[in-house]
Amino acid sequence: MPQSIVEPRRIVLALLATLLAPTGAMSQALPFQAPGDSRLRHMVELDADDDRTPLTTTWPLPSADLRSDERDTMRGYNQPGSATDAGWFLSGAAKPTRLRTFSDTPREKGEAGLQAGWAAGDYAGGAIRLSYAFSPQDGMHYRLDGTYLAWRVGNWWLTAGVQDRWWGPGWDGSLILSNNARPMPGLGLERNSSVPFQSKLLRWLGPWRLVTFVDHMENHRADFNNTLFWGARFSFKPANSLEFGLSRTAEFCGKGRPCGLGTVWDMLTARSNRKYNANSTPGQNLVKQSAQVWAGDVRWHPGDLPVALYWQELGEVFDDRNLRPRQLLQLFGVEFASRYVASGRLRAFLEFADTACGAIGLSPGDKPNFGCAYEKDTWRAGYRFRGRVIGDSMDRDGRRLTLGAIYAYAPARSWELRLRRFDLNRGNIAQAGLVPQTVTTVAERIWNAELKVDGPIGDFRYSIGVGADHGGPLGTPAKWDGRAFLTVSRDWAQAP
């Protein structure tokens, strides 16, 4: 039987055995809150700006960082959030968007499945999601996306599963790691509670969190099968108003590639970013044995003002002899959050992102290097997984300006609106490596509007969204294009 089928079946059997084991947890929050619920994130950041939640730019978010009286109530609904959650979900979409945001919108035309949460005290827990995708873009019908198990050892969680991640302060995109691509199966180590160091030497860092993981990429890739994907992020908050994040990711190993301790050491120390492939053809440019990126970000909420500024930068090139990141991608944003507007809470944001290397520089002579971002020398399938880029959903050479708003009111109800302008694939490069640009192979300009509404109806939860695009390839007449989606779920614990 193919390895790609055997491994998921083993995972499913192990998870089912764990979920069916007797426990004393009845309404306990799970170890993590998954990314994808903008309403939840909006409420969490309101608490963070009041200094009641420590860190908010690294998702999944540990439930231990939520206030103790909110852990069972302030949670997302797109995936299981507590030990009593169990039910089914169904989604359908007409023309699923290729330009995903933090919000969990359907990637496929249709998907149906079962999900449940599980917890054993505060030392173990997880979620299981089994689904079937209709007409999947990557050909994978059966899925475990969102499934994980976690075991706590001291103040650390050991995790195994298929978890979505979002690193950075952006609402519309993350340059280094977003939920645009499907999650990969892997193992991780994450800090549980972001309590500060006790030592005087490091206490100034304030609340801090460390996350690291190793995931398994596709069994069959255009470059090297069974490549591994490593990520690490350190975030800290030295002042109540200021949160920093430092992130690294790398592709390594894979069929036909070295994968010993030396390879791992070179990756961790960034030596592999300056070592060249010994098999490079003489007379041609040497090919670096690297597939690493670095990102830094900051979110600043000045005093009691209802405003926050944020920034993220990704460097495509760096190494152990020159740690200064080069070939930079940039994301900037400003957000305004009100306490109460007509009995609800409003957050508005303006965000700009550019995914062309060096497009935004300090020198007047700086010019964008098209065909650079998310492309790699040796791993020439690039920074992508199952047909989608792992970072910002625009893929390389994009530019986006977004005006967005989130309005949360009543229990678990919210509206979300986005107005966006895209300049996609500005270099008009269809294919820089082994894989084409995943959004468009030609330069396009698109104006976009999207509306999303979430809430409960009786025992059911729904999320409904509509969107419209106006534009198309440069030099051609602009056209209108529409899309819509509906997601419905029901929690058996709430059923009569």
Regions found by a protein language model. Give the residues of each.
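N-terminal periplasmic/intermembrane-space "pro-region" immediately following the signal or transit peptide
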Residues: 15, 26-104
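Transmembrane beta-strand segments that form the barrel wall of outer-membrane beta-barrel proteins
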Residues: 86-104, 124-136, 158-166, 170-174, ...
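Well-ordered mid-protein domain cores that form the structural environment of catalytic cofactors
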Residues: 107-204
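Signature for the C-terminal beta-barrel architecture of outer-membrane proteins
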Residues: 166, 186-380, 396-403, 408, ...
